[in-house]
Protein backbone atom coordinates (compact mmCIF):
# COMPACT_ATOMS: atom_id res chain seq x y z
CA UNK A 1 0.00 0.00 0.00
CA UNK A 2 1.16 3.49 -0.78
CA UNK A 3 2.04 5.96 1.90
CA UNK A 4 -0.15 8.82 2.97
CA UNK A 5 -0.33 11.60 0.40
CA UNK A 6 1.26 14.85 1.46
CA UNK A 7 -1.02 17.84 1.71
CA UNK A 8 0.51 20.95 0.16
CA UNK A 9 -0.75 24.39 1.12
CA UNK A 10 -2.87 26.16 -1.48
CA UNK A 11 -1.45 29.07 -3.37
CA UNK A 12 -3.32 32.16 -2.30
CA UNK A 13 -4.52 34.99 -4.49
CA UNK A 14 -2.77 38.30 -4.96
CA UNK A 15 -4.71 39.76 -2.03
CA UNK A 16 -2.89 37.44 0.38
CA UNK A 17 0.53 37.72 -1.20
CA UNK A 18 3.18 40.15 -0.14
CA UNK A 19 2.62 43.65 -1.45
CA UNK A 20 4.24 44.42 -4.80
CA UNK A 21 7.00 47.02 -5.07
CA UNK A 22 5.92 50.56 -5.76
CA UNK A 23 7.83 50.60 -9.06
CA UNK A 24 5.70 47.77 -10.44
CA UNK A 25 2.42 49.17 -9.09
CA UNK A 26 3.05 52.68 -10.43
CA UNK A 27 4.25 51.48 -13.84
CA UNK A 28 1.67 51.73 -16.65
CA UNK A 29 0.08 48.36 -17.37
CA UNK A 30 -1.88 47.53 -20.50
CA UNK A 31 -4.41 45.22 -22.14
CA UNK A 32 -4.06 44.50 -25.88
CA UNK A 33 -7.09 42.84 -27.50
CA UNK A 34 -8.67 42.47 -30.93
CA UNK A 35 -12.32 42.81 -31.95
CA UNK A 36 -14.40 42.61 -35.08
CA UNK A 37 -14.11 40.06 -37.86
CA UNK A 38 -12.01 36.95 -37.38
CA UNK A 39 -8.61 37.08 -39.07
CA UNK A 40 -5.50 35.02 -38.18
CA UNK A 41 -3.13 37.83 -39.15
CA UNK A 42 -4.85 40.26 -36.77
CA UNK A 43 -4.50 37.70 -33.97
CA UNK A 44 -0.76 37.41 -34.67
CA UNK A 45 -0.43 41.20 -34.82
CA UNK A 46 -2.12 41.44 -31.41
CA UNK A 47 0.34 38.94 -29.93
CA UNK A 48 3.29 40.82 -31.46
CA UNK A 49 2.09 44.12 -29.99
CA UNK A 50 1.77 42.46 -26.58
CA UNK A 51 5.39 41.41 -27.03
CA UNK A 52 6.33 45.09 -27.43
CA UNK A 53 4.47 46.07 -24.26
CA UNK A 54 6.13 43.41 -22.08
CA UNK A 55 6.67 42.94 -19.19
CA UNK A 56 3.81 45.20 -17.98
CA UNK A 57 1.04 43.65 -20.05
CA UNK A 58 -1.24 40.61 -20.03
CA UNK A 59 0.71 38.39 -22.45
CA UNK A 60 -1.61 35.36 -22.16
CA UNK A 61 -4.90 37.25 -22.09
CA UNK A 62 -7.66 35.21 -23.76
CA UNK A 63 -10.61 37.27 -24.92
CA UNK A 64 -13.88 35.77 -26.12
CA UNK A 65 -16.65 37.03 -28.34
CA UNK A 66 -18.96 37.37 -25.37
CA UNK A 67 -16.52 39.75 -23.62
CA UNK A 68 -17.27 43.45 -23.82
CA UNK A 69 -15.08 46.52 -23.35
CA UNK A 70 -16.74 47.23 -20.01
CA UNK A 71 -15.58 43.81 -18.75
CA UNK A 72 -11.94 44.79 -19.26
CA UNK A 73 -12.57 48.25 -17.80
CA UNK A 74 -14.04 46.73 -14.63
CA UNK A 75 -10.84 44.66 -14.14
CA UNK A 76 -8.45 47.49 -14.93
CA UNK A 77 -8.38 48.98 -11.43
CA UNK A 78 -7.61 45.62 -9.80
CA UNK A 79 -4.62 44.92 -12.08
CA UNK A 80 -3.40 48.58 -12.23
CA UNK A 81 -4.12 48.75 -15.97
CA UNK A 82 -3.79 52.29 -17.33
CA UNK A 83 -4.02 51.78 -21.12
CA UNK A 84 -5.79 49.45 -23.51
CA UNK A 85 -4.96 48.81 -27.16
CA UNK A 86 -7.77 47.53 -29.40
CA UNK A 87 -7.29 46.19 -32.94
CA UNK A 88 -10.67 46.29 -34.69
CA UNK A 89 -11.08 44.46 -38.02
CA UNK A 90 -13.92 45.74 -40.21
CA UNK A 91 -14.90 44.70 -43.72
CA UNK A 92 -13.11 47.68 -45.30
CA UNK A 93 -10.24 48.61 -42.98
CA UNK A 94 -8.26 47.85 -39.83
CA UNK A 95 -8.25 50.35 -36.98
CA UNK A 96 -6.15 50.62 -33.84
CA UNK A 97 -7.51 52.38 -30.75
CA UNK A 98 -5.50 53.51 -27.74
CA UNK A 99 -7.67 54.14 -24.67
CA UNK A 100 -6.65 55.76 -21.41
CA UNK A 101 -8.44 53.95 -18.59
CA UNK A 102 -10.81 54.46 -16.94
CA UNK A 103 -12.22 57.76 -18.29
CA UNK A 104 -10.38 58.47 -21.54
CA UNK A 105 -9.34 60.08 -23.82
CA UNK A 106 -9.52 57.66 -26.75
CA UNK A 107 -7.35 57.86 -29.89
CA UNK A 108 -8.46 56.10 -33.08
CA UNK A 109 -5.89 55.27 -35.78
CA UNK A 110 -6.36 53.84 -39.24
CA UNK A 111 -3.77 51.13 -39.97
CA UNK A 112 -2.47 51.51 -43.54
CA UNK A 113 0.22 48.82 -43.43
CA UNK A 114 1.58 46.29 -40.96
CA UNK A 115 4.24 43.59 -40.95
CA UNK A 116 4.37 40.73 -38.47
CA UNK A 117 7.43 40.07 -36.32
CA UNK A 118 8.13 36.68 -37.90
CA UNK A 119 8.33 38.26 -41.36
CA UNK A 120 10.70 40.99 -40.19
CA UNK A 121 13.02 38.51 -38.48
CA UNK A 122 13.06 36.18 -41.48
CA UNK A 123 14.29 39.04 -43.73
CA UNK A 124 17.19 40.06 -41.48
CA UNK A 125 20.59 38.39 -41.87
CA UNK A 126 21.41 38.59 -38.17
CA UNK A 127 18.60 37.62 -35.85
CA UNK A 128 19.54 39.40 -32.64
CA UNK A 129 16.65 38.38 -30.39
CA UNK A 130 16.60 36.81 -26.95
CA UNK A 131 13.92 36.23 -24.31
CA UNK A 132 16.03 38.19 -21.82
CA UNK A 133 15.38 41.32 -23.90
CA UNK A 134 11.71 41.27 -22.84
CA UNK A 135 12.32 41.21 -19.08
CA UNK A 136 12.55 45.01 -19.03
CA UNK A 137 10.50 47.76 -20.65
CA UNK A 138 11.79 49.29 -23.91
CA UNK A 139 13.15 52.77 -24.46
CA UNK A 140 10.67 55.07 -26.26
CA UNK A 141 11.99 57.37 -29.00
CA UNK A 142 9.72 60.13 -30.38
CA UNK A 143 10.57 61.80 -33.70
CA UNK A 144 8.94 64.85 -35.36
CA UNK A 145 6.09 65.31 -32.87
CA UNK A 146 6.96 68.96 -32.22
CA UNK A 147 4.15 70.50 -34.26
CA UNK A 148 1.63 73.27 -33.71
CA UNK A 149 -1.45 71.11 -33.37
CA UNK A 150 -2.68 70.03 -29.94
CA UNK A 151 -3.48 66.60 -31.31
CA UNK A 152 0.26 66.00 -31.89
CA UNK A 153 1.09 66.80 -28.27
CA UNK A 154 -1.71 64.56 -27.03
CA UNK A 155 -0.61 61.75 -29.34
CA UNK A 156 3.03 62.02 -28.22
CA UNK A 157 2.02 62.12 -24.55
CA UNK A 158 -0.18 59.05 -24.99
CA UNK A 159 2.61 57.02 -26.62
CA UNK A 160 5.08 58.02 -23.90
CA UNK A 161 2.69 57.21 -21.05
CA UNK A 162 2.08 53.71 -22.40
CA UNK A 163 5.61 52.76 -21.25
CA UNK A 164 7.27 53.37 -17.86
CA UNK A 165 9.40 56.48 -17.56
CA UNK A 166 13.19 56.21 -17.22
CA UNK A 167 15.17 58.09 -14.61
CA UNK A 168 18.55 58.92 -16.18
CA UNK A 169 20.21 59.35 -12.78
CA UNK A 170 19.37 55.89 -11.47
CA UNK A 171 18.83 53.79 -14.60
CA UNK A 172 20.92 50.69 -15.20
CA UNK A 173 22.17 50.82 -18.79
CA UNK A 174 22.35 47.04 -18.96
CA UNK A 175 18.54 46.80 -18.68
CA UNK A 176 17.94 48.82 -21.87
CA UNK A 177 17.86 45.99 -24.40
CA UNK A 178 15.04 47.22 -26.67
CA UNK A 179 13.69 50.48 -28.09
CA UNK A 180 10.44 51.53 -29.77
CA UNK A 181 10.48 54.30 -32.38
CA UNK A 182 7.45 56.49 -33.19
CA UNK A 183 8.13 58.77 -36.15
CA UNK A 184 5.59 61.30 -37.48
CA UNK A 185 5.60 62.53 -41.07
CA UNK A 186 3.87 65.95 -41.26
CA UNK A 187 3.42 65.74 -45.06
CA UNK A 188 1.57 62.42 -45.14
CA UNK A 189 0.28 62.61 -41.52
CA UNK A 190 1.42 59.03 -40.99
CA UNK A 191 2.99 57.57 -37.85
CA UNK A 192 5.65 54.89 -38.35
CA UNK A 193 6.27 52.47 -35.49
CA UNK A 194 9.39 50.28 -35.36
CA UNK A 195 10.73 47.86 -32.75
CA UNK A 196 14.48 47.24 -32.32
CA UNK A 197 16.83 45.25 -30.12
CA UNK A 198 19.89 47.13 -28.82
CA UNK A 199 23.41 45.70 -29.10
CA UNK A 200 26.52 47.35 -27.60
CA UNK A 201 29.89 46.49 -29.21
CA UNK A 202 33.34 47.78 -28.11
CA UNK A 203 35.09 50.24 -30.47
CA UNK A 204 38.79 50.47 -31.38
CA UNK A 205 39.31 46.80 -32.11
CA UNK A 206 39.98 45.10 -35.37
CA UNK A 207 37.32 42.97 -36.90
CA UNK A 208 39.20 39.79 -36.14
CA UNK A 209 39.65 40.76 -32.50
CA UNK A 210 35.98 41.70 -32.26
CA UNK A 211 35.05 38.26 -33.53
CA UNK A 212 37.31 36.60 -30.96
CA UNK A 213 35.82 38.73 -28.19
CA UNK A 214 32.29 37.90 -29.30
CA UNK A 215 33.13 34.21 -29.52
CA UNK A 216 32.23 33.89 -33.22
CA UNK A 217 35.44 32.77 -34.99
CA UNK A 218 35.36 31.77 -38.68
CA UNK A 219 37.15 28.80 -40.20
CA UNK A 220 40.88 28.94 -39.29
CA UNK A 221 41.94 26.03 -41.48
CA UNK A 222 44.12 28.28 -43.65
CA UNK A 223 45.94 29.83 -40.67
CA UNK A 224 48.95 28.28 -39.01
CA UNK A 225 48.55 30.35 -35.85
CA UNK A 226 46.02 32.73 -34.30
CA UNK A 227 48.40 35.61 -35.08
CA UNK A 228 47.81 35.08 -38.78
CA UNK A 229 44.07 35.53 -38.29
CA UNK A 230 44.52 38.71 -36.21
CA UNK A 231 47.04 40.40 -38.50
CA UNK A 232 45.21 39.60 -41.74
CA UNK A 233 41.79 41.19 -42.17
CA UNK A 234 41.05 39.19 -45.28
CA UNK A 235 39.53 36.37 -43.28
CA UNK A 236 36.83 38.61 -41.89
CA UNK A 237 33.42 38.96 -43.49
CA UNK A 238 33.35 41.50 -46.32
CA UNK A 239 29.62 42.19 -45.83
CA UNK A 240 30.34 43.92 -42.54
CA UNK A 241 30.44 47.70 -43.02
CA UNK A 242 32.41 50.10 -40.94
CA UNK A 243 30.72 51.57 -37.87
CA UNK A 244 29.36 55.08 -38.10
CA UNK A 245 31.04 57.52 -35.75
CA UNK A 246 27.66 58.91 -34.71
CA UNK A 247 26.89 55.57 -33.07
CA UNK A 248 29.99 55.76 -30.85
CA UNK A 249 29.30 56.64 -27.20
CA UNK A 250 31.27 56.66 -23.96
CA UNK A 251 29.75 54.25 -21.47
CA UNK A 252 28.93 55.57 -18.01
CA UNK A 253 28.70 52.03 -16.59
CA UNK A 254 30.37 48.71 -17.18
CA UNK A 255 28.13 46.27 -19.02
CA UNK A 256 28.01 42.50 -18.69
CA UNK A 257 28.86 41.98 -22.35
CA UNK A 258 32.53 41.45 -23.18
CA UNK A 259 34.71 44.47 -23.85
CA UNK A 260 32.16 47.14 -22.79
CA UNK A 261 33.93 48.91 -19.92
CA UNK A 262 33.22 52.13 -18.10
CA UNK A 263 34.60 55.35 -19.70
CA UNK A 264 35.39 53.42 -22.87
CA UNK A 265 33.96 53.93 -26.32
CA UNK A 266 31.39 51.48 -27.60
CA UNK A 267 29.20 51.31 -30.65
CA UNK A 268 25.42 50.97 -30.43
CA UNK A 269 23.73 48.82 -33.07
CA UNK A 270 20.01 48.37 -33.65
CA UNK A 271 18.48 45.18 -35.06
CA UNK A 272 14.83 45.30 -36.06
CA UNK A 273 12.74 42.54 -34.49
CA UNK A 274 9.25 43.72 -35.52
CA UNK A 275 6.39 44.25 -35.84
CA UNK A 276 5.97 47.29 -38.09
CA UNK A 277 2.95 49.60 -38.09
CA UNK A 278 2.04 52.48 -40.40
CA UNK A 279 -1.03 54.32 -39.12
CA UNK A 280 -2.84 57.64 -39.29
CA UNK A 281 -4.66 59.50 -36.52
CA UNK A 282 -8.36 59.84 -37.41
CA UNK A 283 -10.21 60.87 -34.27
CA UNK A 284 -9.73 61.83 -30.62
CA UNK A 285 -12.68 61.40 -28.22
CA UNK A 286 -12.93 62.89 -24.77
CA UNK A 287 -14.39 59.88 -22.96
CA UNK A 288 -13.99 56.12 -23.06
CA UNK A 289 -14.74 55.55 -26.78
CA UNK A 290 -17.59 58.07 -26.37
CA UNK A 291 -18.10 61.72 -25.60
CA UNK A 292 -17.14 64.93 -27.35
CA UNK A 293 -14.90 64.66 -30.42
CA UNK A 294 -11.82 66.78 -29.73
CA UNK A 295 -10.17 66.19 -33.12
CA UNK A 296 -11.23 64.67 -36.43
CA UNK A 297 -9.03 64.43 -39.49
CA UNK A 298 -11.83 64.30 -42.09
CA UNK A 299 -14.56 66.46 -40.53
CA UNK A 300 -13.99 70.08 -39.48
CA UNK A 301 -16.80 71.87 -37.61
CA UNK A 302 -17.36 75.45 -36.54
CA UNK A 303 -17.70 76.61 -32.95
CA UNK A 304 -21.50 76.86 -33.26
CA UNK A 305 -21.73 73.28 -34.47
CA UNK A 306 -19.46 72.13 -31.65
CA UNK A 307 -21.66 73.95 -29.11
CA UNK A 308 -24.77 72.30 -30.56
CA UNK A 309 -23.12 68.90 -30.28
CA UNK A 310 -22.10 69.59 -26.69
CA UNK A 311 -25.69 70.44 -25.79
CA UNK A 312 -26.92 67.31 -27.55
CA UNK A 313 -24.41 65.13 -25.70
CA UNK A 314 -25.36 66.74 -22.38
CA UNK A 315 -29.04 66.19 -23.11
CA UNK A 316 -28.44 62.51 -23.89
CA UNK A 317 -26.43 62.14 -20.71
CA UNK A 318 -29.22 63.61 -18.59
CA UNK A 319 -31.80 61.40 -20.30
CA UNK A 320 -29.66 58.36 -19.60
CA UNK A 321 -29.35 59.30 -15.92
CA UNK A 322 -33.13 59.87 -15.74
CA UNK A 323 -33.79 56.45 -17.28
CA UNK A 324 -31.44 54.79 -14.82
CA UNK A 325 -33.20 56.53 -11.93
CA UNK A 326 -36.64 55.46 -13.17
CA UNK A 327 -35.45 51.89 -13.66
CA UNK A 328 -34.12 51.79 -10.10
CA UNK A 329 -37.44 53.11 -8.74
CA UNK A 330 -39.45 50.61 -10.80
CA UNK A 331 -37.23 47.78 -9.65
CA UNK A 332 -37.68 48.75 -5.99
CA UNK A 333 -41.45 49.09 -6.43
CA UNK A 334 -41.75 45.68 -8.12
CA UNK A 335 -39.74 44.04 -5.37
CA UNK A 336 -42.02 45.62 -2.77
CA UNK A 337 -45.16 44.44 -4.60
CA UNK A 338 -43.81 40.90 -4.83
CA UNK A 339 -43.00 40.95 -1.14
CA UNK A 340 -46.51 42.20 -0.26
CA UNK A 341 -48.15 39.58 -2.48
CA UNK A 342 -46.08 36.86 -0.89
CA UNK A 343 -47.03 38.07 2.60
CA UNK A 344 -50.73 38.28 1.67
CA UNK A 345 -50.67 34.75 0.27
CA UNK A 346 -49.05 33.53 3.45
CA UNK A 347 -51.70 35.23 5.60
CA UNK A 348 -54.49 33.78 3.43
CA UNK A 349 -53.01 30.31 3.80
CA UNK A 350 -53.04 30.72 7.58
CA UNK A 351 -56.72 31.78 7.50
CA UNK A 352 -56.13 35.38 8.41
CA UNK A 353 -57.69 38.52 6.99
CA UNK A 354 -56.30 41.97 6.62
CA UNK A 355 -59.08 43.54 8.68
CA UNK A 356 -58.64 43.63 12.46
CA UNK A 357 -61.78 43.47 14.74
CA UNK A 358 -60.45 46.31 16.87
CA UNK A 359 -60.08 48.57 13.83
CA UNK A 360 -63.59 47.66 12.67
CA UNK A 361 -65.01 48.51 16.09
CA UNK A 362 -63.27 51.89 16.09
CA UNK A 363 -64.55 52.65 12.60
CA UNK A 364 -68.11 51.70 13.65
CA UNK A 365 -67.89 53.96 16.70
CA UNK A 366 -66.67 56.93 14.63
CA UNK A 367 -69.35 56.53 11.96
CA UNK A 368 -72.40 55.59 14.09
CA UNK A 369 -71.47 57.33 17.32
CA UNK A 370 -72.38 54.35 19.54
CA UNK A 371 -70.55 51.45 21.01
CA UNK A 372 -70.99 48.29 18.93
CA UNK A 373 -72.53 45.15 20.40
CA UNK A 374 -70.19 42.58 21.83
CA UNK A 375 -71.33 39.92 19.39
CA UNK A 376 -70.91 42.19 16.37
CA UNK A 377 -67.10 42.21 16.37
CA UNK A 378 -65.84 39.18 18.21
CA UNK A 379 -62.17 38.85 18.92
CA UNK A 380 -60.98 35.45 17.76
CA UNK A 381 -58.16 33.89 19.65
CA UNK A 382 -55.05 34.09 17.53
CA UNK A 383 -52.91 31.03 17.41
CA UNK A 384 -49.34 31.40 16.32
CA UNK A 385 -48.96 27.67 15.67
CA UNK A 386 -50.58 25.58 12.99
CA UNK A 387 -50.55 22.45 15.16
CA UNK A 388 -51.30 22.13 18.86
CA UNK A 389 -48.29 21.82 21.05
CA UNK A 390 -47.63 18.39 22.50
CA UNK A 391 -46.44 17.56 25.96
CA UNK A 392 -42.94 16.49 26.72
CA UNK A 393 -43.89 12.82 26.97
CA UNK A 394 -45.90 12.75 23.75
CA UNK A 395 -43.26 14.02 21.39
CA UNK A 396 -41.61 10.65 20.90
CA UNK A 397 -43.07 7.15 20.58
CA UNK A 398 -42.36 4.54 23.22
CA UNK A 399 -39.65 2.09 22.33
CA UNK A 400 -40.47 -1.56 21.78
CA UNK A 401 -39.68 -3.97 24.57
CA UNK A 402 -36.70 -6.14 23.78
CA UNK A 403 -37.21 -9.90 23.58
CA UNK A 404 -35.65 -12.12 26.17
CA UNK A 405 -32.53 -13.82 24.88
CA UNK A 406 -33.73 -17.14 26.25
CA UNK A 407 -36.98 -17.04 24.29
CA UNK A 408 -35.13 -15.87 21.22
CA UNK A 409 -32.69 -18.78 21.27
CA UNK A 410 -35.24 -21.45 22.18
CA UNK A 411 -35.21 -23.88 19.26
CA UNK A 412 -38.31 -25.81 20.38
CA UNK A 413 -40.57 -22.78 19.99
CA UNK A 414 -38.97 -21.61 16.77
CA UNK A 415 -40.60 -22.74 13.50
CA UNK A 416 -38.43 -23.62 10.59
CA UNK A 417 -39.40 -21.56 7.57
CA UNK A 418 -38.15 -24.28 5.25
CA UNK A 419 -40.30 -26.99 6.85
CA UNK A 420 -43.19 -26.95 4.36
CA UNK A 421 -45.99 -29.44 3.97
CA UNK A 422 -48.06 -30.24 0.96
CA UNK A 423 -51.02 -27.88 0.92
CA UNK A 424 -53.38 -30.69 -0.20
CA UNK A 425 -52.57 -32.77 2.93
CA UNK A 426 -53.43 -30.03 5.37
CA UNK A 427 -56.57 -30.68 7.40
CA UNK A 428 -56.49 -27.65 9.61
CA UNK A 429 -57.52 -25.41 6.72
CA UNK A 430 -60.17 -25.90 4.10
CA UNK A 431 -58.59 -26.40 0.71
CA UNK A 432 -59.73 -24.18 -2.08
CA UNK A 433 -59.34 -24.45 -5.80
CA UNK A 434 -56.18 -22.83 -7.05
CA UNK A 435 -56.49 -21.87 -10.76
CA UNK A 436 -52.72 -21.62 -11.08
CA UNK A 437 -52.24 -25.26 -10.03
CA UNK A 438 -52.91 -27.23 -13.21
CA UNK A 439 -52.46 -30.63 -11.56
CA UNK A 440 -55.39 -30.10 -9.18
CA UNK A 441 -58.98 -30.89 -10.21
CA UNK A 442 -62.02 -29.36 -8.56
CA UNK A 443 -64.51 -31.78 -6.92
CA UNK A 444 -67.97 -30.16 -6.45
CA UNK A 445 -69.06 -32.69 -3.79
CA UNK A 446 -66.54 -32.04 -1.11
CA UNK A 447 -65.40 -28.76 -2.67
CA UNK A 448 -61.77 -29.60 -2.55
CA UNK A 449 -59.15 -30.14 -5.25
CA UNK A 450 -58.01 -33.64 -6.10
CA UNK A 451 -54.74 -34.66 -7.59
CA UNK A 452 -54.95 -35.54 -11.30
CA UNK A 453 -52.60 -38.49 -12.01
CA UNK A 454 -53.07 -38.31 -15.80
CA UNK A 455 -51.53 -34.89 -16.09
CA UNK A 456 -48.67 -35.88 -13.83
CA UNK A 457 -47.90 -38.91 -16.06
CA UNK A 458 -47.99 -36.80 -19.21
CA UNK A 459 -45.60 -34.31 -17.72
CA UNK A 460 -43.15 -37.12 -16.94
From Swiss-Prot:
Residue ranges occupied by any Brix domain in the UniProt entry: 28-290
A GO BP entry:
larval development
| Compositionally biased intervals (Basic and acidic residues) | 323-355, 401-446
Q: What's a single GO CC term here?
A: preribosome, large subunit precursor
Q: Does the keyword Phosphoprotein apply?
A: yes
Q: Which residues form a coiled coil?
A: 295-350
Q: In which tissues is it expressed?
A: Ubiquitous.
Keywords per UniProt: Coiled coil, Developmental protein, Differentiation, Oogenesis, Phosphoprotein
| UniProt modified residues of type Phosphoserine | 237, 239, 355
Q: Which GO terms describe its molecular function?
A: rRNA binding
Q: Which family does it belong to?
A: Belongs to the PPAN family.
Function text: Required for initiation of larval growth and normal mitotic growth but is not absolutely required for general biosynthesis or DNA replication. Required for progression of normal oogenesis and maturation of some imaginal tissues into adult structures.
Its protein name is Protein Peter pan
Amino acid sequence: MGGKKKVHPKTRTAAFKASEPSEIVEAPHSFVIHRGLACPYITDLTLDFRRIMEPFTASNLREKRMNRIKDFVSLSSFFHVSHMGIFNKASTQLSFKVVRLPRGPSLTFKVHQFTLARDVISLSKKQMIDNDHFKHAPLVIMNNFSGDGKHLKLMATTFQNMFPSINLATVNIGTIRRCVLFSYNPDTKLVEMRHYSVQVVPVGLKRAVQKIVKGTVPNLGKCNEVVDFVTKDGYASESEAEDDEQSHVVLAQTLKSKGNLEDKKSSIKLHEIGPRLTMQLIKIEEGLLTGEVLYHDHVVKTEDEKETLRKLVEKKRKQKEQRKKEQAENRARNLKLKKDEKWAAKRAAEGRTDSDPEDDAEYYKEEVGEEPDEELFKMEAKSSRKRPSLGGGMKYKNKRAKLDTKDKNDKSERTDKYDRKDKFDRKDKKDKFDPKNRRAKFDPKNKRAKFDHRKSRKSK
